[in-house]
From Swiss-Prot:
This is GTP cyclohydrolase FolE2. Belongs to the GTP cyclohydrolase IV family. NCBIfam families: PRK13674.1-1. The record marks C145 as: May be catalytically important. It holds the Pfam family GCHY-1. GO terms for biological process: tetrahydrofolate biosynthetic process. One of its GO terms (molecular function) is GTP cyclohydrolase I activity. Keywords: Hydrolase. It comes from Halorhodospira halophila (strain DSM 244 / SL1). It comes from the Bacteria. The gene is folE2. It is an enzyme of class 3 (hydrolase). Converts GTP to 7,8-dihydroneopterin triphosphate. It catalyses: GTP + H2O = 7,8-dihydroneopterin 3'-triphosphate + formate + H(+). Its EC number is 3.5.4.16.
Length: 259
């Protein structure tokens, strides 16, 4: 049978990324306790397509996923990137692997345990044989408005905020380390389960530690700047304002490699 996508294309336009998007597959991720978490990730896999090819081989992307013992690990994620560009005869490739990641947390006063889930994404890129691996963590926190605290006679408005850190690694970093870093720079961190003494503690903790959205990203950026294992990063914070029908947002980007 004729391979239609293998035909020549006469438009002379290269495609930057072509492939499959949002395919789910089992993955295994080792956490800081040394245990493996079995979860399901959503993959997006792309390669470049030279101008003289009509189409790419879409089935090969799925075949690469299926070839990893039906369960992808962090180690095989890096192998997949090289395999993908090799099998599809491309000089650049891009893989994203997004999955829920769970951390067991203790409430601050009673010590009651519960799970917190975080959205994690591994982003791998290869271009001309050069690899880069980025890790993205989305961490919810509580923020309390310094202005509201200053002007109000009783209380202050607070809200849940979402911080997203995307970091280029130049050394090994546990996911929990990035999560801990973010949570320490909020007005207060979140928990899956709180008893009344815990709720009192987190309410007072947030009140004693007010932060604007600008404070959050600057404090996190300062911590990332001090970590030699992180070569570049972006950090965003979105505050889901409790007294407005809009969000507050801030972004800092930094390439510590001097580019």
């Amino acid at each position: 049978m004729e391979d239609v996508q293998g035909r020549a294309d006469t438009r002379q336009i290269e495609i930057n990324k072509v492939g499959i998007k949002d395919i789910r597959h089992p993955v295994r991720v080792r956490d800081r306790t040394g245990r493996d978490q079995h979860t399901v990730a959503t993959f997006s896999m792309y390669v470049n397509l030279p101008q003289h090819f009509k189409g790419t081989h879409m089935s090969r992307f799925v075949s690469i996923l299926e070839g990893h013992d039906r369960e992808v690990t962090v180690e095989s994620f890096h192998e997949m990137l090289a395999e993908m560009t090799d099998r599809l005869e491309a000089h650049s490739g891009h893989i994203e692997m997004a999955f829920p990641y769970f951390v067991n947390k203790q409430a601050p006063v009673t010590g009651v345990e519960s799970l917190m889930d975080y959205e994690v994404t591994f982003i791998g890129e290869i271009h001309g044989g050069r690899h880069e691996t980025w890790v993205r963590v989305a961490v919810p926190i509580t923020t309390l408005c310094p202005c509201s605290k200053e002007i109000a006679e009783r209380g202050a408005h607070n809200q849940r905020s979402l911080v997203v850190v995307t970091a280029l690694m130049d050394g090994f970093v546990w996911l929990e380390e990035l999560i801990d870093l973010v949570e320490r720079e909020g007005s207060c961190e979140l928990y899956g389960l709180l008893k009344r003494p815990d709720e009192k503690h987190v309410t007072e903790r947030a009140y004693d530690n007010p932060k604007f959205v600008e404070d959050v990203v600057r404090d996190i950026a300062g911590r990332l700047n001090d970590d030699g294992r992180i070569a570049a990063y972006s950090v965003t914070s979105e505050n889901y304002e409790s007294i407005h029908n809009h969000s507050a947002f801030a972004l800092i980007e930094q390439d510590k490699r001097g580019r």
